[in-house]
């Protein structure tokens, strides 16, 4: 599953390179309004476009049992109007300005964004500030939209045996962490959810001190400051709710699950609890090195064409797997995992694939990696992130993601410094340290035959608006 791996790796790896040349690097500026709202601005004058993002530090991690999915439902409801905009009017106005907009919900955050001609920034900031402060809708709008969310769950999760297995596996992996709940929510919680549940969540978390506006592109910092003060500044300050720690206890032994689902092939997923990068780790190059070394390890295994997993497990007539993948969760508000997965080749078993995946880790723990592999990962990582800087949206998204995790403005440069200094010995050491049985959860999809008496369910087309970030 190479394509999936690369998407996930991009989600976990923050921006590593701030510009091709330091002398041309636009300065990123951050300031805080009197009401507590953070504003981050990164000018990039190469084209007359801009990205405007509103980040709210609230996601499924902030939900409580019985209301799973409410952060995502609220994201949908933000498009349902204010006292001055009708349902759906927000997006129509952005489109009329020549822009495009969307939103996403993850475990850690909710984000709303517009990609626009830079001379329309004031119009968009006026719209977004109004939506953030004055979202309102009648119960009938909620009743219609909750059915859209339920259908999203049916089509993307319940219609997919692998998605259902991974959902169950996540619940087995985490015991105390809110990460154990699905972002889209349990169907029983969606069935029981009320309009007031969503309004209460909005009132609790959508406060200026829990949000950041990020603007990148063809803009002047002084003008963005003026617009932020004009449109976001009047929003009343309210306390940010106190978050109680929900620390995941140390795992004391392997966890295993067989999940039966209608499928033509088995699938195996191995998750290992690993350290993550935190804000304190950016104080110097010596902190947080294991998390970065683990990300390098994931890339050595599955970060480029012909990487170790593909060579060892997917090639030849006697291959073990049709597909394999590896990724590392580098950072997040909750605990992170290093995940190995694979689909057995014909005649092979999930147990054989699991053993093969672990054998590749053990081989690196015993013998290390070559300088060529290490250099290839570093060059590819830096080149990939540098190329993405052509997108002002990507720049805004990375700055917002860093803010969600409490990282400094120059986190990208500091992370690049860490990456460049990672050694082969460090990759070998983390391969030997973090992949024991006691920190492992193994989930296996056990294929079940299709019942010929049942008509396969064809999911209706869903709106393309909104997305869930599966980080």
Where in this protein do the model-derived segments appear?
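M16 family metallopeptidases and their MPP-like homologs
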Residues: 42, 47-73, 87-131, 161-188, ...
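Boundary at the C-terminal end of the N-terminal hydrophobic targeting segment
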Residues: 20-24
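Bacterial N-terminal signal peptides
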Residues: 8-18
């Amino acid at each position: 599953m190479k394509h999936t791996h690369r998407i996930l790796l991009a989600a976990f790896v923050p921006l590593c390179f701030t510009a091709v040349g330091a002398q041309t690097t636009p300065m990123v500026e951050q300031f805080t309004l009197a009401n507590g709202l953070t504003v981050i601005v990164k000018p990039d004058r190469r084209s007359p476009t801009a990205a405007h993002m509103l980040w709210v530090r609230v996601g499924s991690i902030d939900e409580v049992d019985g209301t799973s999915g409410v952060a995502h439902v609220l994201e949908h409801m933000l498009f349902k109007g204010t006292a001055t905009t009708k349902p759906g009017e927000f997006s129509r106005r952005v489109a009329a300005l020549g822009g495009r907009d969307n939103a996403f919900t993850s475990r850690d955050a909710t984000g709303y964004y517009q990609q626009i001609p830079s001379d329309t920034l004031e119009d968009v900031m006026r719209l977004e500030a109004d939506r953030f402060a004055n979202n309102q809708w009648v119960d009938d709008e909620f009743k219609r939209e909750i059915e859209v969310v339920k259908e999203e769950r049916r089509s993307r999760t319940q219609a997919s045996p692998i998605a259902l297995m991974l959902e169950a596996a996540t619940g087995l992996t985490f015991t105390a962490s809110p990460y154990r709940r699905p972002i889209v929510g349990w169907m029983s919680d969606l069935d029981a959810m009320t309009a007031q549940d969503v309004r209460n969540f909005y009132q609790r978390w959508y406060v200026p001190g829990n949000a950041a506006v990020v603007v990148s592109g063809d803009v002047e910092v002084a003008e963005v400051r003026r617009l932020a003060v004009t449109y976001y500044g009047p929003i009343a300050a309210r306390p940010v709710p106190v978050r109680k720690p929900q620390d995941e206890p140390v795992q004391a032994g392997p966890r295993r699950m067989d999940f039966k689902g209608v499928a033509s092939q088995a699938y195996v997923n191995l998750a290992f609890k690993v350290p993550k990068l935190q804000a304190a780790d950016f104080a110097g190059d010596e902190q947080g090195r294991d998390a970065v070394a683990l990300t390098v390890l994931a890339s050595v295994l599955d970060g480029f064409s012909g990487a170790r997993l593909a060579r060892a497990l997917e090639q030849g007539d006697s291959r073990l797997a049709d597909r394999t993948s590896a990724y590392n969760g580098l950072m997040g508000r909750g605990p992170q995992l290093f995940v190995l997965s694979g689909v057995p080749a014909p005649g092979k078993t999930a147990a054989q694939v699991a053993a093969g995946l672990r054998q590749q880790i053990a081989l690196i723990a015993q013998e290390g990696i070559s300088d060529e592999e290490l250099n290839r990962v570093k060059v590819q990582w830096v080149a990939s992130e540098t190329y993405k800087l052509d997108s002002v949206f990507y720049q805004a998204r990375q700055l917002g993601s860093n803010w969600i995790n409490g990282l400094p403005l120059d986190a990208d440069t500091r992370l690049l410094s860490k990456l460049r200094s990672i050694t082969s010995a460090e990759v070998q050491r983390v391969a030997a340290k973090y992949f024991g049985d006691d920190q492992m959860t193994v989930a296996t999809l056990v294929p079940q035959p299709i019942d010929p008496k049942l008509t396969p369910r064809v999911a209706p087309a869903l709106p393309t608006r909104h997305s869930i970030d599966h980080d």
